[in-house]
Amino acid sequence: RKETAGTIVVDSDARYLYYVLPEGKAIRYGITVGEDALAFSGLAKVGRKEEWPSWTPTNDIKKRLGNIPAYVAPGPHNPMGSRALYVYEGNRDTLYRIHGTNQPEYIGSAISSGCIRLTNEDAIDLFNRVKVGSMVVVLAPGQGDSPSNPRVAFTGGRDVN
């Protein structure tokens, strides 16, 4: 499928997020993705945006990670980082986020609880470009443009081999 300008495409396999520009161009950002069992894939939209978000871990995250605070205020110690895009399916909050991070050393890894993390600088740049209602396409494992599955997201998934 060919995505329209303003769409976010997440290629979890390659660990990149693309913000689609006019004329078939895109801005590419390095990302941290969710562990396979925790990752989101499919079509969604940006339901809301927040600068310096707070973080309230879900019960599942509390069980999985153990001793973590029930709430983290905005700021440099908040794992949500500088900006957050809230991913919705229809009018339902999926609880998945595209957000900054206070751990930029993990960009390129698959260690999150499902969210897509960017450096804080990249999160600010993306936040300033994206509108509420923008389409979010998260490619399923094996559907991205990685060495193990060389497909191209912007040309309808045609093989490049």
What function would you assign to each model-found segment?
Residues 1-60:
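Cell wall/extracellular polymer interaction/catalysis modules
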Residues 3, 28, 37-38, 42-43, ...:
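Exported/periplasmic cell-wall-interacting domains
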